From Swiss-Prot:
Family membership: Belongs to the heat shock protein 70 family.
Biased composition (Basic and acidic residues): 602-623
NCBIfam families: PRK00290.1 (NF001413), PRK05183.1 (NF003520), prok_dnaK (TIGR02350)
UniProtKB keywords: ATP-binding, Chaperone, Nucleotide-binding, Phosphoprotein, Stress response
Region ranges (Disordered): 599-637
InterPro entries: ATPase_NBD (IPR043129), Chaperone_DnaK (IPR012725), Heat_shock_70_CS (IPR018181), HSP70_C_sf (IPR029048), HSP70_peptide-bd_sf (IPR029047), Hsp_70_fam (IPR013126)
Induction: By stress conditions e.g. heat shock.
Function: Acts as a chaperone.
Molecular function per GO: ATP binding; ATP-dependent protein folding chaperone; unfolded protein binding
Protein name listed in UniProt: Chaperone protein DnaK
The encoding gene: dnaK
Length: 637
């Protein structure tokens, strides 16, 4: 069995880790960084950039530079959270044919899983470059509070990237694995507070050790899948835009280029204010009017930032109370508090969490890497490389069906350990009913319409009978990824209908296959593009070198040879403007052949210069006179 890599597919940053022997190792990407910005750019030339290269060109290409895509994955266009994002994102979020939120890139509609797959491909390539082998399997993490549709969409992204997703695990659970693996003996109850770029989770986890086997059992989980660092950035951006409008009377919101520059600076200022009390946001030439260019220079203090985002931090405290209540624990039962996610570096976040739990959070867990490390550990468990670790995760939300009167009847309650299976008998609501519709729901509300609809199916062929007579057995089966399978069976006839809940919108099998094929085709195109760039660079270097030699040796070479070389140079320069790799290679060889005489002259000149330098050094040595000296001994006293 090959390596199963662990991937933290984050809203702001992503990270990949592997098990190296019995130790997890976070891998550096091609740019030498251990985390990769979850940013994807589609350039005018048709190139797809991921990570830092995408981030670097965001200012000049705001409409086609996509970030925080995880906030849209598995979501409907009409969702309130999506409608909020439409107002603040520089790129174009559109409604797809199935009602999902998609993105319009260069007049082409793209699904969030298809875009996220580009980040996963980079993570896969990072692992392949390090290991020197093809990677086909991965464990990918998701926020604990992700619903079924969001989990399915994440699995789809993995497939499009060419990965078989062996397991989807919750981010706080992964962080607990990273924390608990090398800790000493004894049982501990920990709280994992995970505030990332776009999502917030809290999980209460019990780590037990029996006969050298560690069991990580999730007791309860809660959260908010639309609360994170991006919201903190938005508050600061809005403040800066408002201040600038007060000073200059210009609203920067109408200028995507200015907003992209402002986003970058706001993120930087927020990070700086975690260690400094004050910072300057200084953006010269941010815009212009009839009076000339305008510059933005605003001082931001830590206190000001805290006043802008305090309500967001307080929003994260309520789920802590619910999670503790669901686990049947109080704050005094918590041994350790672990902080995960880049936003937890903010001092105010740390102090509010410390105030709630009555203890300082642990500082020995890397908030950016812990989740990927935990995913790698789970990958090791699945491949058999890691022994004596058992992970018991939970389903974050209750699952049930709609029953008479539009009520949701739960079959599996939230925080039930998975995998799990539960059956319940239901009956018909009307006389002589020959079919029932099973409407599957996820959520905590009593009214069906207030919960998320996961899908519905019909069970036909029920024998006509008075209402309440037929017996329909409905079974809910949740697998280790937290994905639901539902069956309904007529006890009398034995007739059964089964479905794996696919998000009622989501990508269908045909769409996923098409995206997988597109990704494979693009991979080939990307390889060809990379080879073209390398050949082009080789050609550029040769042109520069020959021009330099031609200039230095213009008096030593015959006029005819000079003309031939110049002609070959012109041909290569023209070829470099095109996209034909073989044409560039042909002209490189041609120039090398024709300029061989010039290279020979240049080499002889270099040898002569070297010889002259040596002779000059020897002459200097001949003129040196050795000093004479006489040793004088001290007279004896």
């Amino acid at each position: 069995m090959g390596k199963i890599i662990g991937i933290d597919l984050g809203t702001t940053n992503s990270c990949v880790a592997i098990m190296d022997g019995n130790k997890p190792r976070v891998l550096e990407n091609a740019e030498g960084d251990r985390t990769t910005p979850s940013i994807i750019a589609y350039t005018q030339e048709g190139e797809v950039l991921v990570g830092q290269p995408a981030k670097r060109q965001a200012i000049t290409n705001p409409k086609n530079t996509l970030f925080a895509i995880k906030r849209l994955i598995g979501r409907k266009f009409k969702d309130d959270e999506v409608q909020r994002d439409i107002k603040i994102m520089p790129y174009n979020i559109v409604n797809s044919d199935n009602g999902d939120a998609w993105i319009d890139v260069k007049k082409q509609k793209m699904a969030p899983p298809q875009i996220s797959a580009e980040v996963l491909k980079k993570m896969k390539k990072t692992a392949e470059d390090y290991l020197g082998e093809t990677i086909k399997e991965a464990v990918i993490t998701v926020p604990a509070y992700f619903n079924d549709a969001q989990r399915q969409a994440t699995k789809d992204a993995g497939r499009i990237a060419g990965l078989e997703v062996k397991r989807i695990i919750n981010e706080p659970t992964a962080a607990a694995l990273a924390y608990g693996l090398d800790k000493g003996k004894g049982n501990r109850t920990i709280a994992v507070y995970d505030l990332g770029g776009g999502t917030f989770d809290i999980s209460i986890i019990e780590i037990d050790e029996v006969d050298k086997e560690k069991t990580f059992e999730v007791l309860a989980t809660n959260g908010d899948t639309h609360l994170g660092g991006e919201d903190f950035d938005s508050r600061l951006i809005n403040y800066l835009v408002t201040e600038f409008k007060k000073e200059q009377g210009i609203d920067l919101r109408n200028d995507p280029l200015s907003m992209q520059r402002l986003k970058e600076s706001a993120e930087k200022a927020k990070i700086e204010l975690s260690s400094a009390q004050q910072t300057d946001v200084n953006l010269p030439y941010i815009t212009a009017d009839s009076n000339g260019p305008k510059h933005l220079n605003i001082k931001v203090t830590r206190a000001k930032l805290e006043s802008l985002v305090e309500d967001l931090i307080l929003r994260s405290i309520e789920p802590l109370k619910v999670a503790l209540k669901d686990a049947g624990l109080s704050v005094t039962d918590i041994n350790d508090v672990i902080l995960v996610g880049g936003q937890t570096r903010m001092p105010m976040v740390q102090s509010k969490v410390a105030d709630f739990f009555g203890k300082e959070p642990r500082k020995d867990v890397n908030p950016d890497e812990a989740v990927a490390v935990g995913a790698a550990v789970q990958g090791g468990v699945l491949s058999g490389d890691v022994k004596d670790v058992l992970l018991l995760d939970v389903t974050p939300l209750s699952l049930g069906i709609e029953t008479m009167g539009g009520i949701m009847t739960s079959l599996i309650n939230k925080n039930t350990t998975i995998p799990t299976k539960h059956s319940q008998i239901f009956s018909t609501a009307e006389d002589n009913q020959s079919a029932v519709t099973i409407h599957v729901l996820q959520g905590e509300r009593k009214r069906s319409s207030d919960n998320k609809s996961l899908g519905q199916f019909n069970l036909d062929g029920i024998n006509p009978a008075p209402r309440g007579t037929a017996q329909i057995e409905v079974t809910f089966d949740i697998d280790s990824d937290g994905i639901l399978h539902v069956s309904a069976k007529d006890k009398k006839t034995g007739k059964e209908q089964k479905i794996t809940i696919k998000a009622s919108s989501g990508l269908n099998e045909e769409e996923i296959k098409k995206m997988v094929n597109d990704a494979e085709a693009n991979s080939e195109a990307d390889q060809k593009f990379e080879e073209l760039i390398q050949t082009r660079n080789q050609g550029d270097q040769l042109v520069h070198s020959i021009k330099k030699q031609l200039n230095e040796n213009k008096n030593s070479i015959e006029e005819e040879s000079k003309k031939d070389i110049q002609l070959a140079l012109n041909k290569l320069e023209n070829a470099l403007k095109g996209e034909d790799k073989s044409d560039i290679e042909k002209n490189i060889q041609n120039l090398l052949k024709i300029s061989s005489k010039l290279t020979e002259i240049n080499q002889k000149k270099s040898e002569k210069d070297q010889k002259d330098n040596n002779m000059s050094a020897n002459k200097k040595d001949e003129n040196v006179v050795d000093a004479e000296f006489e040793e004088i001994k001290d007279p004896k006293k």
